[in-house]
C-alpha cells in the first residue's frame, strides 16, 4: 500500500503517483509552512495515549504481534512518543526556540569573535555583526533541508515511522520507502499520525516499493535534498552509487555491540541481566550483544602455558553462563519455526567444521541457546536468537583490537568493578564506542538518544545566511 497526502492507494498506482509527486513537493515548498514541532509532538502524544489504552491491540495482533511482547513494545514506543520526551529531544538537539510558535520567533543580536560563533547555532535565527566589519550585519538561520528520502531497515518494528517523525520534527517533507520486511506497522502509524494532525498530510509520503525497482527509487532520490539510509554496509554502498551528485547522504548503518567483562564483573546478577538482554532482543538490534569479551590476561597469572590458562578461564565462564542463558530462554516467547530452523542449520554447519578441524571454535549447546567459544578475534555478528560468541580480549589489547572495527561499533554492556568503570569507559570511548551501559540496558532507548553518536535533527537541517 501507498500513503500519499493522507490517502491510501494501491501499490499498482505507484508510477502514477510518482508522476505528480514533484509538483506536489514544489507546491508545498513554495506555499506551505513547515509544520511546527508542537504540532508533531501533540499528534505523537495523542497516538501514544491511544496505543497505551489498547485502541490498536486487535489491529496489532492481526499484524502478527504476540500479546505478551506487544504490551512491552507499545509501552517502549509510547515512552519515546510522549510529549515530555519529544520536547526534551527538540530542546536538546535544536534549542528552546524551536518550541515557540514560529520558526522565526527568536532573533538574537551578538558581537562575537569568529572562534565563538557556533557553526550550527541552535537558535532559528541569529543576527550577527562580523568583527572588523561593523557596517554590515549577518543573519544566520537554521531551516529544514527540504525533502528527505528515507530508506529504512526492517530489523526494528516501527523504525521507518520513527525516522519520518524525526524528519517532521525538523520541518521536512518526508518520502519513505518501506523495507521488504515491514509488516504494515509503519504505514499505519504514519496514517494515524496524519489523522491526528491533517496539516501533516503534504509532508508524509509512504511507498512500499520493492528494492529491485531501481527506476522508482532513483526518481524518489532525485526529489530529495537529503537521503536517510538505514542498513548494512552493502545497502549503504548501493545508495552511495545512485544518490544524485550533491545530495546530502545521512547514513545510519548497522552496528555491532558487545559485552566486556572483567573478573570483578562476573556476578550472578550481572550475568542474569546480560542473559535476559540477549534473549529478549534476540540479538537483532544494533545495540544487541553479539559477543562477550572477557578481560583475560594469562601473563598476569605467572604460569607457563598462557594459552591453556586463557582457554581454561573461558571454558569456566561458558559453563557458568550457559545455564543462566537457558533460564532466560524459558522465561521468553519461543522462536518461530523459521528462525529456529535457521539457527539450527548454522550451528550444525559449525559443528561439522569443528569435527573436521577447520575451526578454532567450540560450541556449548543449551536448550534454545548456545555459546560459541572462540580462541581470539574481534567483534562480529553472532548466529543471533540466543546464540552468543565468547572471546578473550585483555584490556591492554582492547583499543588496538576495536579500532580495526571502529566504524561499526555502537554499544558496550560493561560488567566490571566500580573502581574499574571510569578507566574502562574512557578507553572504550577512545576505541570508537558510542554508548556504554550496564548489562541489562544495552538496548534501552529514549527520545534523547543520539544516532551513531550524532543528533539526527541537526543533520536534517541546514544553516542559511542573509547579508545586507
Q: Which role fits each region the language model picked out?
A:
Residues 1-140, 409-413:
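N-terminal Rossmann-like NAD(P)+-binding subdomain of aldehyde/semialdehyde dehydrogenases
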Residues 58-65, 69-80, 86-94, 98-103, ...:
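Core active-site phosphate/anionic-ligand binding loop and the adjoining beta-turn-alpha structural block
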Residues 111, 131-279, 300-304:
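Rossmann-like NAD(P) dinucleotide-binding subdomain of oxidoreductase/dehydrogenase enzymes
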Residues 419:
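Basic, glycine-rich polyanion-binding accessory segments appended to enzymes
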Residues 148-151, 175, 292, 410-414:
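Short hydrophobic beta-strand segments
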Residues 39, 43-50, 192-199, 324:
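Generic non-transmembrane alpha-helical segments
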Residues 2, 8, 206, 248-250, ...:
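Conserved beta-strand scaffold positions in the cores of enzyme catalytic domains, especially
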Residues 281-289, 293-411, 422-431, 436-468:
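NAD(P)-dependent aldehyde/semialdehyde dehydrogenase
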